[in-house]
């Protein structure tokens, strides 16, 4: 989100081209980053699911990755719309007759609404997934209780703020969502890496 391009006011055709290029690069990086994050989420789910003392894997962890997969599809659509479709429409608008401006703005408003809908779906679904992972960790371990507690609180707060409309998912609003969720993923990842290192050392000592 730190390199997400922002455009405001009247754009020249040259500015529209530069905005489209910057938007494509930023959103491509976002897609690649989220793919890596999703792979990490799969590893996290395997770790949490194995912590259940029963013979079957923990259902909360399994439900979390299913919900997160749903969130991933929504994010893919939102990113494609914001990063590729919207800039392409703006380029076409800049080269069209000025008299067609109102029609183009209606189209852009509709596409933006489409983007916002999927951004909300992603933000809420990803928060629910973090809540489920955190609840699984609180029940069976696998992640530090402080990290799990933060995940529960952050997920609920983000969901409520989005639901009541206090958190608008523009560039700055999405930055808040991404940062709050990224903090949880980074902390959980560090904890899992330390646990793995500790387990390896114990095996070597044995």
Residue ranges and their predicted role:
Residues 1-206:
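Hydrophobic, aromatic-enriched alpha-helical segments typical of multi-pass transmembrane helices
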